[in-house]
């Protein structure tokens, strides 16, 4: 998957975890850069502040699903890998996680 500057990034997460959990955290990292992914909304709720990681409480995850949108706003001089890491959280501890890498370039 390739991402371009200012392009809307759309993601879908389904939690298939049988144990108890409080919510999920989505962390992102643009490798080789200090820039951030800008979160726009999740499950139809606008995000008004700039956050480096997105926590979604289980209470707002109908059917254990989250849909989100984000963007990357800077113009890269080179290609970057972008890591999306989602963790299932129970009582402030990570119980499971999954990662996805995508390519970011102009």
What residue spans do the PLM features occupy?
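C-terminal beta-sandwich interaction modules and adjacent acidic
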Residues: 1-106
């Amino acid at each position: 998957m390739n991402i371009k500057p200012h392009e809307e990034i759309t993601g879908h997460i389904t939690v298939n975890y049988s144990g108890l959990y409080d919510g999920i955290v989505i962390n992102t990292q643009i490798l080789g850069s200090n820039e951030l992914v800008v979160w726009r909304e999740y499950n139809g709720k606008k995000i008004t502040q700039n956050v480096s990681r997105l926590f979604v409480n289980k209470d707002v995850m109908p059917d254990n699903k989250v849909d989100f949108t984000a963007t990357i706003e800077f113009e890269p001089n080179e290609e970057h890998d972008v890591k999306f890491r989602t963790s299932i959280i129970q009582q402030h501890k990570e119980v499971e996680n999954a990662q996805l890498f995508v390519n970011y370039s102009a």
